[in-house]
Amino acid sequence: MSKYKRYAIVVILVSNGILISFLESFIPIPIPVPGVKLGLGNIITMIGIAFLGVRDVLFIVAIRCFVVAVLTRGVMMLAFSLTGGILSALVMALLYKKFSSMFSVKGISIAGALVHSTAQVIVASFILGQFVIMYYLPVLLVSAVITGFITGSIGEIAINEIRRKDIFGNSPQEHTDIDFGNILHSDKSDTLIKKHQILPKMDSGVKLFFAFILSIIPFLCENQISFIIISAYLIFITIFSGMKVRTVLTSFTAYFIIVVFPFLFGFLISLLFYQISGNAMFTYYQQISDTAIRMFQLFLLWYIGCIYFNTTPMKSFIGLFDKILTPFKRFGVPVEDHLKVIMCVIKVLTQIGPEVKRSFTESMSSMSDNKKWWSRINIKGISGIIVNFIVNSFKRMDAIEKYVKEVNAADLYNYRLKVSRLDIVASVSFVIVVFLVIIIENGYLM
């Protein structure tokens, strides 16, 4: 298999995984638990394990986690999704390659879901510095068995259908009517950024430097006034940038579900066990105020990332990322090719994403006319929708392979430092805020 054909397959599978996840909003989870999703995107991981090498599977997982984190403006989520995704992929690959006679695809999917949930809880516990989050793990493990079985059932049907049609074989693929040459000229990768926003006009590198420093400062602060100043500054930036209220609320909600709720659940369980048993093992020793400060510090980090990616053009950010990764090029790492793959995924999503979502909506609506929740967990029907979508998506493989091979990286992403008057004004305001925090932390105003 040529390098560019492999890249084309990665582009198709990653974009498929992200688009398939849209179906989750139509499928109720039998046991609704905050932070738990069906994980339909993991079907793509299982397909990769069945037909590709482990290295390609890890590449697919890494690209999918990165693209989702950037597009959903939740870059802090990368630590959770990447850790869980990589570990679960390795476990599923091991079971499929070495123990397929002992485990079915459903069983392998359940194992992957268990590992994914465990890894994410451990990461959350480590980041927050709170062991009580581990009390939330049993709830997630029970949910993982259910969601893993559903995902594995669909994945098994998809794998069998792909194997039957020999999609990954050497037989020529049907062509699609989508002209990927036009994608290069129709740049829709930054459609989520309003044209009237001011922050996108700032230099991406200057803005990244400010975001990085501003993310570190809260972890060095001890005075409450410093947190008030930083919060006020971020509120001003939010208003000034013209961010949607929905985006802000989504950021708050996501942080609560992923970080705050597991802690509160674990804390209450710990308190309950202590009241029942009186065992000191369940005592919560840390001050609530210290925990609240830690959560607030992490939220500021979370929200700063949200602001940055919500106001930064994708082409500019990927171009800046290319500059940052320049040292790796000297060691033979194909940075340019990998970034081209990322941009191609984004372009495929923006080009066909709306139409795919409409198609999914119509298909799922026709399956749930009686409005009963269990009628929407129609594994066979959902499998048919997903399999047809995946099979049809490979009709674009030849076009995508040619596009990835011939397109110039400079046409996909670029970055050049350009300091404007807006950058200077932003720098002055940033320096003032940092100066105020420094003098407050040193007690000069107290």
PLM feature spans:
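Hydrophobic transmembrane alpha-helices
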Residues: M1-G48, F180-F212, I216-C221, I225
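Short helix-perturbing small/polar motifs within transmembrane alpha-helices
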Residues: A8-S15, L19, I60, S81-V115, ...
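Interfacial aromatic-anchored transmembrane helix boundaries in multi-pass membrane proteins
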Residues: S21-L38, V61-M92, V105, V132
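Generic transmembrane alpha-helix motif of multi-pass integral membrane proteins
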Residues: L40-D56, V91-Y96, L214-P218, Y233-T238
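Transmembrane helix interruption/hinge and helix-loop junction motifs
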Residues: L52-R55, R73-M76, S101, Q130, ...
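Membrane-embedded alpha-helical hairpins and interfacial helices in multi-pass inner-membrane proteins
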Residues: G74, L78-A79, S101-P172
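Transmembrane alpha-helix interface motif
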Residues: S171-S226, I230-I239, P354-M446
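Juxtamembrane/interface alpha-helical elements of multi-pass membrane proteins
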Residues: S251-S368
